[in-house]
Amino acid sequence: MTKQLRMYTVKPGEMDAWCEEWRDKVVPLRRKHGFEVLGAWVIEETNQFVWVLEHEGKEDWSVPDARYYESPERKGLKPDPARHLEKTPHWFVRDP
């Protein structure tokens, strides 16, 4: 099982809109593609949104991730929820 930590910087004034679109559009679509969201948090002081995503498949992470981004449903998200984001770094993490 592979886990990824994502730490997004959200554009000023757009956190509520981002959270709503993430919750209503991104999360259900990620789940449809075999991902599970393990947790999500807002850091008000830095205008950041942090979440942890997991995929249990035996495939390399890039395979289901590409399927997600290339899916008609993801391409059809209009407007694109990513418009709320300034930076989107992410890292693979493991349990200690």
Predicted regions and their residues:
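Short, acidic/polar linear motifs in exposed loop/turn regions
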Residues: 12-14
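Short glycine-/aliphatic-rich beta-strand segments at the starts of folded cytosolic domains
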Residues: 2-10
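Long, low-complexity, Ser/Thr/Gly/Pro-rich intrinsically disordered segments that act as flexible linkers
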Residues: 42-48, 84-96
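An amphipathic, aromatic/His-enriched active-site/gating alpha helix that lines ligand/cofactor pockets
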Residues: 17-38, 54-91
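Accessory recognition modules or surfaces
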Residues: 6-7, 42, 47-64
